[in-house]
């Protein structure tokens, strides 16, 4: 069967986001996730966010990104993963807005638009574990 351009486009965009999220996390684990978390706490020290919340978020963020990245890459639980990724982007945007890093907020908004597109066009998620193994269309 010839791969349709629509299915190919969806696959490539989903893979791009999956690889992106996976490789946001992997270098942090290689360097030590605690270092990333501690840097986050320091970076947010001048914001009204409580340090214990930043500490907790910084502790789990790399794991969440890795899980989202892997699930997007293989196309498993794609809809739920995209919702989780969108919620994560909202949380990141709140923190980044407190830091007033508007260039980063703009980048996070672009991620959110991409996740919107992936959710909106999910009927094109043909090449995925969801469809192949679980019979989802």
Describe these PLM feature segments.
Residues 34-44:
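Peri-membrane helix termini and adjoining interfacial loops of integral membrane proteins
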Residues 1-35, 51-63, 67, 74-137:
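Extended, low-polarity transmembrane helix blocks
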Residues 42-49, 90:
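Short glycine/proline- and charge-enriched loop/turn segments
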